Swiss-Prot record:
Transmembrane segments: none
Catalytic reactions of this protein: guanosine(26) in tRNA + 2 S-adenosyl-L-methionine = N(2)-dimethylguanosine(26) in tRNA + 2 S-adenosyl-L-homocysteine + 2 H(+)
Protein name: tRNA (guanine(26)-N(2))-dimethyltransferase
Trm1 methyltransferase domain: residues covered: 1-343
Top-level taxon of the source organism: Archaea
Organism (species): Archaeoglobus fulgidus (strain ATCC 49558 / DSM 4304 / JCM 9628 / NBRC 100126 / VC-16)
Annotated binding of S-adenosyl-L-methionine, by residue: 25, 50, 66, 92-93
Gene name as annotated: trm1
Length: 349
């Protein structure tokens, strides 16, 4: 079986290939083309589709790896068919990354990236790209799995994808600090069943300590959906409504993108990719977000248009935006009581 994707045509019979991730790979090519790196290491290559596309569409010198001898044969055949030259390694990804350094490493596993992160952070020199499809462990649906894999506690909130993405970023950033590396998200997103983050790496003892200023906790009340941002070492009392706070974290509280980089990526995009990137660019970086249907349900209110709530928050002097992952969610630095007050005041069409 052969598939065409981007400028590549590859055989996928007998190896893992997920057609649902084509949108992600399309977007990745724009990201890779914006990065100023030359080398790209596809640690878990399978068919080799992403690495081959990186070579053809982003001009990268791709290095491929897979633990399966069958996958290695498929990759080699696909390289020949596409006229691409590249080193192909048959090895355990974590072991390979311990043996040599790579300019840009991509960890795109089936499931959790956690088993590969220590080695990836040790090896990556300038860029690190990470995918997670075990969203239940990250967003609070599987609390124990989140603790074991990512070393952070989460409960499922009304905006669980916001929590999940920040929990993933926080985990990767913490792993890298062990090697005096500071990681910052260039661009990140949530879509369907996965989270995707592209990091810039800075090798610096001082900066690797400073990233913890962007790390902390989210105090969440399941009774009224209130959220409070807490820095490392801070605590939370009972919620104003009388409910008990759950302390989610540690998670990343900083920016989910670097605007100048994301804008350059968007300039290369068309159609659905451009529309998706514009949503990401329009989104503010506040770690607090609210599901308007969930708030409206608690207070038995009719739901206003999301854009109306965003504009009302801005009129009051708060930062506010829609989210790229939920059509009825609002990100804002305003307290939840302010959002509820707006919901109460609107006469809905």
């Amino acid at each position: 079986m052969e598939v065409e994707e981007g400028r590549a045509r590859v055989k996928v019979e007998g190896v893992f290939y997920n057609p649902r991730m084509r949108f992600c790979r399309d977007l990745d090519m724009l990201v890779f083309a914006t990065m100023d790196s030359k080398e790209y290491f596809d640690a878990l290559s399978a068919s080799g589709i992403r690495g081959i596309r990186a070579a053809l569409e982003a001009g990268k010198k791709a290095v491929f790896n897979d633990v399966s001898p069958k996958a290695v044969k498929v990759i080699e055949e696909n390289l020949r068919e596409n006229g691409v030259s590249g080193e192909v390694i048959n090895g355990d990804a974590a072991a390979v990354m311990r043996q040599r350094a790579f300019e840009h490493i991509d960890i795109d596993p089936f499931g959790s990236p956690a088993p590969f992160m220590d080695s990836a952070c040790f090896s990556a020199k300038r860029y690190l790209s990470v995918t997670a499809t075990d969203t239940a462990a990250l967003c609070g649906s599987a609390t124990n799995s989140g603790l074991k894999k990512y070393g952070a506690f989460a409960v499922k909130t009304d905006v669980y994808h916001e929590v999940g993405l920040r929990m993933l970023i926080g985990f990767v950033v913490r792993e890298a600090t062990k090697y005096e590396k500071a990681l910052f998200p260039l661009i990140s997103w949530v879509r369907e069943h996965y989270y995707r983050v592209h990091f810039k790496i800075k090798k610096s003892t001082a900066m690797s300590a400073k990233v913890y200023e962007k790390m902390g906790y989210l105090a969440y009340c399941s009774t009224c959906l209130r959220k409070k941002v807490l820095g490392m070492g801070e605590g939370a009392e009972r919620c104003e409504c009388g409910g008990k706070f759950s302390l989610i974290g540690p998670i990343w509280l900083g920016e989910l993108k670097q605007r100048d980089f994301a804008e350059k990526v968007a300039e290369k995009a068309e159609g659905k990719l451009r529309a998706f990137l514009e949503k990401i660019l329009a989104e503010i970086d506040a770690p607090t977000a609210y599901s308007l249907p969930a708030l409206a349900k608690i207070h038995s209110l009719t739901l206003p248009p999301t854009d109306v709530v965003v504009e009302e928050l801005k009129k009051l002097g708060y930062e506010a935006s829609r989210t790229h992952y939920c059509g009825f969610c609002v990100k804002t630095d305003a307290d939840r009581d302010v959002v509820v007050k707006i919901l109460r005041s609107r006469k809905i069409i």
